Amino acid sequence: MRVLYVTSEAYPFCKTGGLADVAGSLPPALARSGVEAAVILPLYDRIGEQWRRQMTFRRYIYVDLGWRHEYCGLFSLERQGVTWYFVDNEKYFRRGRLYGEFDDGERFAFFSHAVIDLLPSLDWMPDVLHCNDWQTALVPIYLKDVATRWPEVRGIRTVFTIHNIEYQGRYGADSVDQLFGLDRGWYDDGTLRMDGDVNLMKGSMLMADAVTTVSPTYAAQLHDPRYAEGLESVVDAIGWKMHGVVNGIDTVGYDPASDPALPAHYTPEDMGGKAVCKSSLQGALGLHQEPDTPLIAMVTRLVGHKGLDLVQQAMDGIMATGCQFVVLGTGDGQYEDFFRWKAGQYPGRLSAQILYAEDLSRRIYAAADLFLMPSRSEPCGLSQMIAMRYGAVPIVRSTGGLADTVKSCQVGQSDGTGYLFGDYDAGAMLSVIGQATGLYRGDRAGFDTVRQRGMTEDFSWTRSADSYRHIYENL
């Protein structure tokens, strides 16, 4: 089984979000499971010199996209049992950033077409093209388009993964031929048409041989108009080929027993180092040195769907539990200003770190007793799994991947790893925070059992890779 994983970003080469973590971890896990895996992504100028020095130039071609005739170079390197291919074009990928350009549609149409045109230049012809989000949504469509005149690619199957359905790749109707170089029939027959515009994600969902999302609960929720962003009828139509596969995390990189960012190390069997991490963070962030005060943390983008309006409503109630609170992240100004204001109201008890620093995030995970993630929507989420790995008990809303990865430890549950609430309501969130801090104060041994149970959960990519391999083999 040969799989070419098509992505617009991949860690450690370039990253803006969770897609990069998935693209950097899943293909090596597939390789370990026996799949011949390769990855192809754009050669952005942000990819560092340390990686460029390892690359080999393979060849160049020209890609025809509508009336455009563009240079396309191909580079590669080997890493973790995977060949990583890089598509070079300075016009499109020398921008200083990955996304947010006026011509993103053209840039990623070029990349998607280049993937198809470069297939003969790879070490092998793939059995499966695995595409991700709107940036690569044209790949299954271009493949179908060229298959009528290119018999060698007719046996290739496609998988399309929806990481976040909010971003669909919507463009004007005239972009079909002018921008994407496709026959108008792709729009006229409804494949790419939605509400009078082109919708790339819709087209890929219809044309791919299988569609996956990043958790079973999120896959089920996409039938609901509240979550599907207008695509619920498409989800209903393709339900027979849709799968939910929970993401994993890099359990080697995220390991409190060896993480170089931590002032002390610890394991589920020997938790002494976690107290050192907590004390160290309290000192660094100006919090009172109180080892027995529960420390609640958030490491998040400060945007609305992360549930920050609930936190705003409940903040004083949270602090009334007698806890300490740390938030790390950047985003919407209203939330940044809110947390700065609250930090001033609660000196020594609330720290607002309005920035993002990887090492600091790891220190926060290691120091925290509880990790708050009250998302309005969360396709999968990685933070709750990282938190459990570092012994921070998650408090999450039961939605998307949060519902699939956190087991309730409310009364009567013997295998719980965290606290869940269902209604999107500040009172419901505050109630479970009270339960969690109450257990911490009233039954430390019981709390530590929950903490250690979460640390031993298997969040490796092995299970995810096995699920994807099963999907590939049954296309």
Tell me what each language-model feature is.
Residues 1-475:
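Catalytic cores of nucleotide-sugar-dependent glycosyltransferases that transfer UDP/GDP/TDP-activated
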